[in-house]
Amino acid sequence: MKWSLEFIDEAINDLKSLDNSQRKQITRAIEKVRQNPLPDYEGGYGKPLGNKGNINLSGCLKIKLKASGLRAVYRLIRTETTMQMVVIGLRADEEVYKTAGKRLQKIRSE
């Protein structure tokens, strides 16, 4: 079953900021994972995140493109079968995870 896909506004901007080849790579990866975005321990493609340094990313999953260094962090809204993209970017110095933590804090406080 294909899950619906939702981007928070900042994640749309992240996607737009990538060059064309990076955008194609991450879009293909997202579409693949979207077929079954559950965590790998539930038979899906998602790689669970826990705590990265002092950043609580529990409940989030990642898509990792090793060759290009791109990462996408998403969370599942199971009641709506929605895959919500939180951040897309380069892994450089864990920056993508720091950004995800900040955005999740904002989402959770709304």
Task: Walk through the language-model features, giving the residues of each.
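Residue-level marker for the onset of beta-strands and adjacent loop->beta junctions
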Residues: 1, 59-61, 70
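Arg/Lys-rich, positively charged N-terminal/basic patches that mediate binding to nucleic acids
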Residues: 1-32
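A structure-centric signal for secondary-structure junctions around beta-strands
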Residues: 2, 27, 57, 80-82
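A general secondary-structure junction signal
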Residues: 5, 47-49, 67, 89
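A broad, low-specificity signal marking well-ordered, structured residues that form hydrophobic/aromatic
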Residues: 5, 61, 83
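Short, conserved clusters of charged catalytic residues that mark active-site
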Residues: 10, 55-58, 69
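Enriched for short, Lys/Arg-rich terminal
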Residues: 13, 64-110
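A short, surface-exposed loop/turn module that caps and links secondary-structure elements
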Residues: 35-64
